[in-house]
Amino acid sequence: MNIRTTLYIMTALLAVSCGRKTGDGPTVSRFDGFTQGTTYHILVKSDGPLHMENEIDSLLTEVDNSMSLYNPQSLLSRLNRNETDSVDGFIAECIRTARRISEQSDGAYDITVKPLTAAYGFTGDVPVQNPDVDSLLKLVGYDKIAVENGRLRKADPRMQIDLNSIAQGATSDYIAAYFEKLGIEEYMIEVGGEIFCRGLNAKGKPWVVGIDRPKEGNFTPGADLQV
């Protein structure tokens, strides 16, 4: 059984618990599914069951259509193919945030690594036999791109952007902001391992997050957790 199949089964089982009431206490509504080539799990504590599947799906679709490299028609995919230079608010904010992190890390973090990740077969790309790394490195550099007046400027049109390292965290923030507008104050959001928590869980305690132990052979999510 591969990891994707395992995740699907786990998600299906977890979805059964949606809207479960914990004794005489509050209700915890659960929402699970797939987005951006990964999974998401959301828990919301409230006085009664919440039916927000369509709203959450709409938010996730909006982000997917903007930043997902797994979606060939997303705005980011089109930017990488130079079919447009217009950016939306999601991409502009992620590029600004990424640049700040790149500057703080002296360039150790860099979202322009897409030519390299593509050459080695990440995000669904076909690996290149014996890639010319030196040539590809000339297309990498966070200071070679900028957003000006809603448009992406590249020093070289062959440059490409990979937001996978930041997109899922931004998605969690986006959903959290939506909950805040609705007055929802206690929830846990996890998108592709990027987590946003607020308030307490149904037992009145801080949310507890399990992380797969990083050891060889631990391929099944949830099989060996460290808390």
Label for each model-derived stretch:
Residues 2-8, 16-227:
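Mature catalytic core of soluble alpha/beta enzymes
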